[in-house]
């Protein structure tokens, strides 16, 4: 981890990271810019990504896309997965779904107490960092509203 930017509370961190995917001959080194948001409350663990070919065939490997009722367009455009599908469906309110539908695609992962957000598997430029920061601040607000609605 390098090129770190964070707020004084250390709850909102932007950073560049190098990591490896795969093994042996298929090993690939990845460099990317990520945003980590520490939450003040607990939310369901989930992964949200753009629906693509790999996500569509992952059903054969046992992975299941969680559908959000009355939001078929969202379910076609995004791949949502997590262990507690009922809690995730309850958490993804109409406003949260609309938030994701009306913004550029970002990969978003929640472990329950924090959220990790990134866009592309490469180091972001200044304009992309500003966009990621802006998206993250607005996402943080939306997630807070969702926790108040279900809590």
Question: Which residues make up each language-model segment?
Answer:
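Charged, low-complexity intrinsically disordered regions
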Residues: 1-151
């Amino acid at each position: 981890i390098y090129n770190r930017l964070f707020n004084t509370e250390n709850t909102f961190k932007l950073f560049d990271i190098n990591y490896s995917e795969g093994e042996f001959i298929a090993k690939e080194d990845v460099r990317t810019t990520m945003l980590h948001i520490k939450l003040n409350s607990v939310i369901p663990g989930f992964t949200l990504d753009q629906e693509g070919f790999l996500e569509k065939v992952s059903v054969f490997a046992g992975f299941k896309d969680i559908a959000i009722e009355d939001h078929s367009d969202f379910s076609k455009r995004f791949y949502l997965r997590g262990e507690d599908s009922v809690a995730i469906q309850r958490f993804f309110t109409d406003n949260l779904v609309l938030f994701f539908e009306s913004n550029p695609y970002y990969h978003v992962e929640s472990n329950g107490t924090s959220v990790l957000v990134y866009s592309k598997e490469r180091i972001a430029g200044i304009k992309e960092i500003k966009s990621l920061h802006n998206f993250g601040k607005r996402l943080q607000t939306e997630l807070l509203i969702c926790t108040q609605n279900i809590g």
